[in-house]
């Protein structure tokens, strides 16, 4: 967009700590400025102050701070801001009330019902954003053609709907007036199915605005997409944040004469486009700051590197942002920020907990970086404010940061330089711990120098930052080594060469304004307007005309909006998108057809079908041509081209680069003389050989030995990364190498999982992510597994070790094994484990093993889904594999495995597998995942040698062992100091009366324990029997919870423990016993008993509340949340899954659209948590009304025995399963049953509450600080993928 000549253009990135200002001045030259975002003693607003200083510098005259600035010389102001993100993190937004369909008052509190941290017994979860809830009397449901339901209406998706209850506006008016009287002025309105039937929300909005509410966010307008939970969170975030943003914008404008009425003021949105300040809203603002950086490197590095794909690496103080650009922005349409899931287009920026301010720890022999951060206050130790030791301090100790290049803004008076002495002193304390462990630990070794310790922490931090980059690239079929690393942010330049080397990249590109690249990106960005609407059409020739009409209508909206902002049509471009998925799957992809022109068999807007198939194949490795493709949403993105064009390239060099000074930098092997160059003095063509430092006012760039930097014609730094000279690593324990191997081993398991998810075909594995992949040592001991599904933690190693003992020498190259038998380490039969032994030249036995365990939706048995509620013997639960060679001599044994999967059909009343095609496809995917693991470990062996890799497999297990021994010693010492015995015990009962007894004897001298389950009841005639492997998984889960911090989860966790389980008991049943209920129910009781013995917390709901619904046309399975137990310093969380399960629940709108049910209520069961000084969490109430005849099955516990309280706390309420027949008859179904239900019947599930902790009469604890979000705001598709994996 053209702008008047001779005026200023400002681009400002207002970050959490610093505000960066990039100004194009009259005449075209550039000024940049960095200042503190908060400095109330000197100025009220950092962006205004930045503009004032630059205007003052250019005008050569003082401009008083207390007077509005003359804006007549300003053409435009563009801003990215963390105002929205900070308000979310600190929970300092507007007071909001939520208006929601009756029966769903707690829907957003329950959310997906999954907890964020699997192993934190306190279940910390960010609180909801709203202050009050009003339930709205209204209801819309999807039409299913039942008799007597009235005339259906058509929604905007094309779906037919029934308005069962219009909005009762009369009743609502009085409630809204009550909110106004209590000072609430902002509303979020979230009604069922409003994405397609928005009329009810619109009626509520009109009423609310008439009554005087200043902000009303309708979910149908904030983001009209199916799924009420994320849409509701989005509407709440909009209502919570937009008033704060508007106040900030208004306050900013008041700092200028005329309040910027004649200045173009634009704000960066989360999707990478600019928006006028009057349309800038909360739900589109949470990535406003980091989005500018992505735009910056996409417009600079990508173009200058000839279109080579780029990884953006933005390392700041608290965290690092990682992203990818290959010619178009990569967006996600649902992501969590500060615990709030938003449905809105956002750049896929992955935020990880490793930054310059990340704290450094030495724990149980392991170097640990983050996730805790020093923050801006007190900051790293070198800030002179008593802060902890951090990555920044390590770099300062190594000489990679020069205090003289930083302003004197540190210390209590903010007038001192950085303090290397403070960094050394803080790091010496950690080095003392390191060397004490090295000299007195299990494997005595020579102590490390302070510099070696600092170098170790830097290397561990680098490896931590490489993991998300590998996930972002390899997970989508991209080779990370084929990318350029675009490095920016204040701390990134010190780590760029090492990161690139670790990922195999050849080139690092650092923009000359890398310390302010987010501000530069704002200057280069375009104005964007998007329009989107939901859809439910098939992508087929008969719908192409409708799709073209919808796209044309949305395109017209975008063009009109941009023209209204002053853009001529010639500067406006549009891009159309369809949100497509295969029918029957949940994996939708937002695809553009800009590279696929229209054909005779496509819409006029382009061949979206070809684009979808191409991307699906690239990301998942196959397509499903026999399945129809469904259109979920139609979207158009309009762009008004308005980015500035910068032409301030430096002059060509006229001589060799001038060395400003020489300094000492520490690298592998010791200190090296290192020249220091000033970026401002370098010219085009200058070449600098590493090692060297390049300094400017905003960043420090380290060019490592073996690398070469060259100044490009645009003044940027392009570093050619040379191959690293490998150091000598021996098999003896090195804590630095141990930390690096820990990351490498975990990365192998993670990448195996990505291959499995990409190549599997079933919903369970591809979309629900119900699988684990793992690496094992030569003895079958677990080394690493991902994700950490609790019930898989101890079981897979039992499976591998059984095969080693069972087959002995009958294992050969090219063999792949299949097993699921409970006696062979299986958890339940649908979990099929594929194991590949790995041979190495010169070795006669396998040198390690890889395995993948995946839940197959059906493997036969008496009921579809292979999880029968009434099985009494193992054969009724499906196909059984004790030790089966799935691949023999490199040949997949399809005929034999097919016969085995069909074998259950020979058992009376049973069927063979009902989905052989998916079984075979997923088994092949598991074999492929194992092959990836073999390749990656082979690369590791090639780098370090077999003896070293196997040694570190042992070292990482010993590290986990040490952490558990430390915990057991601390627990025993605490009891001894209080005069209590070193033996603890606990007992609980299953609902059938079967006791589970545990006695734990602690040895202080050994740091070990005996867990003795003697006295536990015998196996039962039913399916509550838990295989031994399930009990071991429950034990590892509990030990990890009791340790209370991140440790490697592997075989070493069980090394300090001897487990006694009576043969033939419910915890180690006979080989013929049915076990499906043991995996999902008994495992929870085992956890309650172990945690009860240690007094860690009261009992949680102790049940997964398994509900199955099916008939000839459909099948549905869910597990339902309950109350978590309270602990010594926390109230139990309400409405959440606990311990051995973390499954997400189906969104209510998806549930009603796919299955013949109406969800009438889903809310907390208030008062069901046990009373106590700390109260137990409440269970939930869930009511399903049936619209078709079906078979309902429930498999539940805690219907007889209540979840216990501790230390005087009262037990939680029992669960209750009620069936209310259409005629009004109410029946208690008991804990386990199957019953036929008919249209009009209602199933009412009341789940148990958690136990209370402490005497209810004790004084209540003093109120804490206001609820805040989680300590570290991880973000992006890599984080969402891990969250989804851990919600199984």
UniProtKB/Swiss-Prot annotation:
According to the UniProt entry, its GO molecular function terms are: 5-oxoprolinase (ATP-hydrolyzing) activity; ATP binding; identical protein binding
What subcellular compartments does it reside in? Answer: Cytoplasm, Cytosol
Query: What keywords does the record list, in alphabetical order?
Result: ATP-binding, Cytoplasm, Hydrolase, Nucleotide-binding, Phosphoprotein
Record note on what altering residue 1089 to I does: In OPLAHD; likely benign
Enumerate the catalysed reactions.
Answer: 5-oxo-L-proline + ATP + 2 H2O = L-glutamate + ADP + phosphate + H(+)
- One BP annotation, GO: glutathione metabolic process
Q: Phosphoserine modification sites?
A: 1265
Q: Which domain of life is it from?
A: Eukaryota
Major enzyme class: hydrolase
Q: What is its main location?
A: cytoplasm
Q: Where is this region: Disordered?
A: 1248-1272
The UniProt entry's GO CC annotations, sorted and at most eight, read:
cytosol
Task: State the disease link.
Answer: 5-oxoprolinase deficiency: A disorder characterized by calcium oxalate/carbonate urolithiasis, and excessive urinary 5-oxo-L-proline. Affected individuals have recurrent episodes of vomiting, diarrhea, and abdominal pain.
By sequence similarity, the record places it as follows: Belongs to the oxoprolinase family.
The name on file for this protein is 5-oxoprolinase
Query: What is the species of this protein?
Result: Homo sapiens
